[in-house]
Amino acid sequence: SYIEKRRNRPTYFVSIQDRFSQIAVVNTRESNIRDISENEKYLDDVFDVLREQYKFPIDQSAIYYLFDRDPKSNTDPALIEKYILSLANPYDNNDYKAGQLLLSYPSIESYLVSNFRDAANFLRFSLGTDAKKYIGQNTDIQINKISEETMINAADEFLQYLVSERIAFNIDEFSEAGHAIFTKQEAEYLAGRGFRLFSMLTLAFLQMGIIEMEEKLQ
């Protein structure tokens, strides 16, 4: 089943076409990343509805927080760094809430581009609007054309970025790698070179086994 709670919409959208999987997509009350902790009650209330009304197994589910690193929408690097280190596991974070922060540089459109472009991780954009403009100029890059083959290409771009930046990583314990990515990307942006195109969304697919990584690539 698929359950969706959009920002500023009172109702939930539910689809039961796939009875073998359960996915819930929830917007924070505001689009800014600080809403993760500043509006905790809102998310807690949504989780309660999912548990009680839709029998969604929140406590046994992988939780991911997807946000853009676009410096115009998320302006507090120190807070982002804090979330990278504390939201480090989709299931359990000791004394902190469950969930893994997945950043895209500069925005989630990076994942879409990486589905359709080889060496996409060498493209550079400063803002999410730049990535959207690139997509608008390349009409073959379309979300409805994403397939198993294109997702594998995106996964390869994910891995190639890590290799090219010499970032050691463990798929199940990715916090240190995520922090290294953030540090390198911030330095690139502050030097005026923009962000290298990169999305951590692939990490979720690897952690959940939707995409499997060959041993020789690790």
Write out the residue ranges for each language-model feature:
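RecA-like P-loop NTPase motor core
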Residues: 1-52, 57
